Amino acid sequence: IHRKVIGVAHLMFHLPPNDKSLKVIHGDGIPFMKEHPESTDILMIDAFDPDGIPRNFRSLSFFDLCKSTLRTNGIFVMNIWASDPHYDLYIDRMRRVFEGLILVIPTGKPGNQIVLGFHDIPKELDVKTLRAKAKLLEKTYGLEFLSFFNQLMLHNHQASSMITFDQ
């Protein structure tokens, strides 16, 4: 667990400083999650060691713990590599724990993918609204949100059960 990762997130990914709506905690997240059920709106996991994602981040119990940490309407976000030998296992376990409510977004960097797991079916999901929000976020933060949205739509055929196309 390296504090430098938080600095990189501020520098490279525009992670804002802590304030009343964001609190970044440096430490072992597993004990924190066990002690704080239903306490998190967005849980982001980006855990790699020299051999890839550590073993304890692959278990069904880990993904169950992640979901139990989320509040109603919370979102789980995990960075994974499509080339990881355990890729199908991660996706299967996330799909089981989040009852099929997952979306995979290729990031444009070969092999790197972001997986979103939803505690509940998201409330506001129509294509027109989401595309407009992606454009606004892209303009505000200078990150490729519209590209991410387009990749999400392209690579998630099951998204049509969560996203409406009639507006």
Where are these regions (language model features)?
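C-terminal substrate-binding/active-site "lid" region of AdoMet-derived donor-dependent transferases
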Residues: 60-124
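Generic domain-boundary/flexible-linker signal
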Residues: 7, 54, 87, 125-128
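A generic structural signal for alpha->beta connector loops
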Residues: 19-21, 73, 99-101, 142-146
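Short flexible/disordered coil segments
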Residues: 34-42, 59-61, 108, 138-149
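SAM/dcSAM-binding transferase cores
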Residues: 113-167
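The AdoMet/dcAdoMet-binding core of the Class I SAM-like
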Residues: 1-72
